[in-house]
Amino acid sequence: EIMPSLVGSEMCIRDSNDIAFKGKRSVEWSDVEKYLRQYVGDIYRIAETEDIIYIGTDLPDEYSGSNYTKHIKGTIAKAKANAVQAIPEMIEIATSKTFEDNKKNKHSRHAKNGWYRYDTRFALPVYDENGDVERYNVFSARLLIRHASSGKMYLYDVLEIKKETSKSCQE
């Protein structure tokens, strides 16, 4: 569900009944990778720019096994794992498109036309001891989009996930 936030921009809020990775002590990234495979072949549109974003076969592996993913822990790792359920909405509400040239030889074929980054936001429920939703934690993140030689833009990863302080929203 997409809702306006307390500060005026939109964010995606996950319903407490559909959190796939809740209550897990550590993230099983292979499960996240499997979950992401359902999106391969899907196409989404960013409302602000009307850019079309494709989901390619490289997303599940990159999202769950990137250097960024390997180095995150705790709340941020769980947030990234659960954000997979909100990918369509996170793409739709993305803002602040920026471009950067491809700098790595290993990406010269798949990101021949460089990279785009977009800001996005999502919120995840926090539960009390009874399993009821107590509040939502709000996160900001950057979508990393590769611009292929075909001219198509593909979601490659979600990076720079940060919990927004003092912006938790109440149910």
In which residue ranges do the predicted regions lie?
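Generic detector of low-complexity/intrinsically disordered segments
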Residues: 5-8, 126, 157, 161
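Single conserved hydrophobic/aromatic residue that forms the stacking wall/gate
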Residues: 1-13
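Compact soluble domain cores
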Residues: 29-124
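Extended interaction regions within the primary functional domain
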Residues: 10, 15-16, 39-44, 50, ...
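Beta-strand elements of well-folded, non-transmembrane domains
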Residues: 122-126, 145-147
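A short, surface-exposed interaction/processing loop segment used at functional sites
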Residues: 27, 132-171
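Intrinsic-disorder/low-complexity loop/linker signature
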Residues: 50-51, 104, 130-131, 150-151
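Acidic/negatively charged segments and metal-coordination signatures
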Residues: 17-26
